[in-house]
Amino acid sequence: MPKHNKLLGAFGEAYAARWLATRGYIIITRNWRRATGEIDIIAQQDDTIVFVEVKTLRCTSYADLAIIVGKRKQKRICETAKHFLASAREYNHMCARFDVIVLRSDPFRRQDVDIVHLPHAFEDLV
């Protein structure tokens, strides 16, 4: 992955975590990795554990939102979420939810950030 894309992704994930925190979410961890994949943000909202995939794009149409996180990626996120829950049993009593946050911005051109939060973006596919 080109360095520019990594920086753009890191910017988006940090921005999304701050955005969620200002809305009352408790950020549990970021960039949680296992062999099955990575979850960008794991947060808590009331009695729900929220697994968040963040996509930062320089340009896209909102008509494309349905294909931004494909079925294969969704499955990897779900598998990784199960590993998280197995290793962090204190969250097992909570409901789980999979969200997607899409940011449209190019911080290298000092563009404003346009954010779309899609709660319940997909269901557990495993």
Curated annotation (Swiss-Prot):
GO terms for molecular function: nucleic acid binding. It comes from the Bacteria. Gene3D superfamilies: 3.40.1350.10. Belongs to the UPF0102 family. PANTHER family: UPF0102 PROTEIN YRAN (PTHR34039:SF1). This is UPF0102 protein TP_0913. It comes from Treponema pallidum (strain Nichols).
